[in-house]
Amino acid sequence: VFPDLKLSGILEGLCGQFQVEKVTSNKTGSRIKVYIVSKKLVQKEQLFCLEKNIKEQLFPKSNVEIVIVERFELSEAYTPQNLFEVYEESILAEFKADNDLEYNLFRMAEVTFPHENVMNLKLPAAFVPEMVEQKLKEDLYNIFAHRCGLD
């Protein structure tokens, strides 16, 4: 998709793990979204690094924002609990990049799995606006259900 993109090491190998489904741009051209699908988990920090490389190499003088939208087709061996164990740092990295409040709430939350497919999230005792709590739940649901294919 980006023939002029030069990657090395981990990023080069990373690109072999996924397929680009489509590339879109908003009307002003200020944001380009690259939709990828992978049969393996790709850590969010690696995708942030790939976004940065695309921006720096292909759009160095532009204010365009590059966003990689990932989707995983994982094996049925993944449950919410074992996915969380290997993907927690990526969830934290995503929250940190998007919303400091969500990041700090999630970082301080107590996460338990009373059943393999049920996640309980106990937020800190501090006052948390209901809309922030709801957004955190929605974001987690989107990560587990839509991105990773677990319901």
Predicted features, each with a name:
Residues V1-D151:
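Intrinsically disordered, low-complexity basic tails and flexible linkers associated
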